[in-house]
Amino acid sequence: MLAKRIIPCLDVTNGRVVKGVNFVELRDAGDPVEIARRYDEQGADEITFLDITATSDGRDLMLGIIEAVASQVFIPLTVGGGVRALEDVRRLLNAGADKISMNSSAVANPQLVSDASARHGAQCIVVAIDAKKVSAEGEAPRWEVFTHGGRKGTGLDAVAWAREMAQRGAGEILLTSMDRDGTKAGFDLELTRAVSDAVPVPVIASGGVGNLQHLADGIQRGHADAVLAASIFHYGEYTVGQAKQFMAEQGIPVRIGS
């Protein structure tokens, strides 16, 4: 079985790492280069950088930050936020990103995912899906895709959208539960499992990690291939090394050491 990955996530706005609850109430968590270096030293498998206000503010790509991080950090970097065209994908890859994450732009122009995958390979195209439960109590569970940092509903069904994105050439799905984001209540395992079981590509579970058991649950009960977390790592509650140790003790295959 392939090793399961632990991925710290750095939400960036105006050049600083921030963390919020349910996509709002942002608080400062530090300098992206310093934080990325710390996670590299702790044994993170990858790091994800998301410029969470680039699309809604109409800002350009964070090329300078990515160049600075890539010069000091030697694990794969996934970068998203403000990617609107094929040229943006190329510029971020040239700046040192290994994978490019698309969210709002994939909804606005699904062909961009197909084109980027055809040109650069599925292995470096990630589609990020921010999903919110919209079914009523007692109904079959349904989740809607939101864009623009969670501010705009799309009417798209999250499971069907994930399936379409995989068919169009996304090599990975980064799935965030908006209901759980920043709450520390654990992943939305029902959502994670529904998407993981529906697509043939790896799914990264995101949104809601409050302890190490939640990470293990994302893999074992949510069927995710990787787990992403922010708060528990940023504020020093746990290290990536402790998370890997815990998961190994639960019988989950992880990479420990170089």
From Swiss-Prot:
One of its GO terms (cellular component) is cytoplasm. Pathway: Amino-acid biosynthesis; L-histidine biosynthesis; L-histidine from 5-phospho-alpha-D-ribose 1-diphosphate: step 5/9. GO terms for molecular function: imidazoleglycerol-phosphate synthase activity; lyase activity. Its EC number is 4.3.2.10. Pfam families: His_biosynth. It is found in: Cytoplasm. Keywords: Amino-acid biosynthesis, Cytoplasm, Histidine biosynthesis, Lyase. GO terms for biological process: L-histidine biosynthetic process. It catalyses: 5-[(5-phospho-1-deoxy-D-ribulos-1-ylimino)methylamino]-1-(5-phospho-beta-D-ribosyl)imidazole-4-carboxamide + L-glutamine = D-erythro-1-(imidazol-4-yl)glycerol 3-phosphate + 5-amino-1-(5-phospho-beta-D-ribosyl)imidazole-4-carboxamide + L-glutamate + H(+). Gene3D superfamilies: Aldolase class I (3.20.20.70). It comes from the Bacteria. The keyword Lyase applies. The active site is at D11, D130. Heterodimer of HisH and HisF. Belongs to the HisA/HisF family. IGPS catalyzes the conversion of PRFAR and glutamine to IGP, AICAR and glutamate. The HisF subunit catalyzes the cyclization activity that produces IGP and AICAR from PRFAR using the ammonia provided by the HisH subunit. NCBIfam families: hisF (TIGR00735). This is Imidazole glycerol phosphate synthase subunit HisF. It comes from Ralstonia pickettii (strain 12J). The gene is hisF.
